[in-house]
A protein has these predicted regions:
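Active-site-adjacent betaalpha module
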Residues: 1-45, 49-87, 92-292
Length: 292
């Protein structure tokens, strides 16, 4: 089916009209293709493609609109070659450890957005004091920072939703291939950030061989989404931990034209990806060049 019957390319990444504009095409979708066999070859893992990460969102990633356009085209062009799609959704409430509401100084001020909370910070937790202070100490020991982010991806808000044109494409994929798109929520624990989809920032959780097997039977795990510097990078780092198990030998293909770093993190992120690609089967590629 022509792409313009599935999405409105001019509105990608912008506040958008009701889904009803495209429901008239659903019956056409249903009869366009027959069910396609799942060969367990290609898994598309889309990280946090949500409205709040678009350029007009509350935590904007400059370049996210083009990322979504490229990703939509990639799915459309490879409809018969993608065996499974999983989508993660950053899912928060207003009172979490990485938001202003959690911290206050002696004068009653909250930290600014993008502030870094250290163990010796003048800002003190208003909730779960002991656990919060331990969390910051553990992060600092791991050379990680607790960043105060703008409020984003609050459950029930427009910002939490998948970018609508991508959601149209996911619906199209599901209807014509008869394959369910799996949606995974992450990040609801108020006491920890959760960038990667498998484990929180500070956690005693060990990734298991059972979980490894759920991903390892795919030849290729294709990764896209936002933001490259945080949730995409950490998800790939956690995926790389699966290589310790005999049942995981997948290629991890990163679509670099379908993911963008938060501004200011680009150089550090590129260095980390180069390190991962030199050590593991992490392949940095492009949605227009990749052959499945």
């Amino acid at each position: 089916m022509n792409l313009n019957k599935i999405i409105d390319s001019d509105s990608v990444g912008f506040p958008y009209q009701s889904i009803n504009k495209y429901t008239c095409n659903i019956n056409e979708f249903l009869y366009e293709e027959t069910s396609l066999k799942n060969n367990h070859k290609n898994l598309l893992l889309i990280i946090d493609p949500q409205n709040d990460f678009m350029e007009d969102g509350s935590l904007p990633v400059k370049g996210a609109r083009n990322d979504m356009l490229n990703l939509i085209s990639f799915i459309h062009n490879n409809l018969k070659k993608i065996d499974k799609i999983k989508v993660s959704l950053d899912t928060h409430s207003y009172t979490q450890i990485f938001y202003q509401s959690w911290w206050q100084d002696s004068d009653g001020n909250h930290p600014d957005y993008y502030s870094i909370i250290k163990s010796d910070s003048k800002f003190k937790p208003l909730f779960h004091k002991k656990q919060s202070e331990l969390y910051v100490k553990h992060l600092n020991k791991m050379n990680k920072d607790l960043v105060i982010w703008p409020y984003h991806c609050i459950l029930g808000t427009y910002g939490h939703n998948i970018e609508p044109n991508l959601e149209n494409m996911l619906s199209y994929f599901s209807l014509v291939t008869k394959k369910k798109v799996e949606k995974i929520t992450k990040g609801s624990n108020p006491l920890s950030e959760m960038y990667g989809i498998f484990r929180e920032e500070y956690s005693n959780l060990k990734l298991s061989s059972t979980l490894s097997a759920a991903y390892g039977h795919y030849e290729n795990i294709i990764v896209a989404g936002e933001a490259k510097s945080h949730c995409v990078l950490e998800s790939i780092k956690q995926l790389c931990e699966f290589y310790q198990f005999d049942n995981f030998n997948s290629n991890i293909l990163v679509l670099e034209d379908c993911t963008t770093s938060i501004q200011g993190y680009e150089e550090k992120t590129d260095i980390e990806f180069k390190m991962l690609s030199s050590k593991y089967n992490v392949i940095l590629t492009d949605s227009k060049k990749i052959v499945l």
